[in-house]
């Protein structure tokens, strides 16, 4: 796991510790365990990133002697399989069966978008690295906290550079056909067109396409 991702995960968990303090009545602060759920991906094409997420959380808990805000932590990890349907099932299990106080994850934007209405309904705080723009812009969720950038943010300076420095006027874009890829290209298009450019065509190869030849 990179130092950057490890630092971000530690920041998320530190925020979780603050929530642990706020959610528990003072009388039970020492006695009641803090239930921490993780929605991650351990199977399928996104598994590498999901496994790193779990390793980061486990490392943090080991370093803190399995405590957060003075409370013992009960940790629950759920494999979403990297699908919206799997994410919906697993988040319901964490909330309704395991009774978690806070959820970390999921990894992918399309997973996050699949569960945002449910999270708002059950009012369980969700801390995520997923970059779905809608969660903080078009469909803000008061129970969601992002610990990373949005999908489109990194594309804004790239589009400005292409238009202003490279003087490009017409571009064909290519990105994976899933939520993150669409939001990335949407961010690029907005800034590029604001600077006088034009997108001629958008290409959407399926996720994890091995061959990009015509």
Q: How would you describe each model-predicted region?
A:
Residues 76-84, 202-210:
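Short beta->alpha junction loops
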Residues 23-41:
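C-terminal segment of N-terminal export signals and the immediately downstream linker at the start
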Residues 7-28:
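N-terminal export signals
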Residues 84-101, 161, 213-214:
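Short, well-structured alpha-helical segments in soluble
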Residues 37-56, 78-84, 107-108, 175-182:
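Extracytoplasmic "Venus flytrap"
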Residues 100-207:
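Extracytoplasmic ligand/sensor domains, especially the bilobed periplasmic-binding protein
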Residues 31-36, 65-74, 84-85, 98:
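Conserved N-terminal structural module of periplasmic/extracytoplasmic solute-binding proteins
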Residues 44, 54-75, 194-197:
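Signal peptide-proximal N-terminal region
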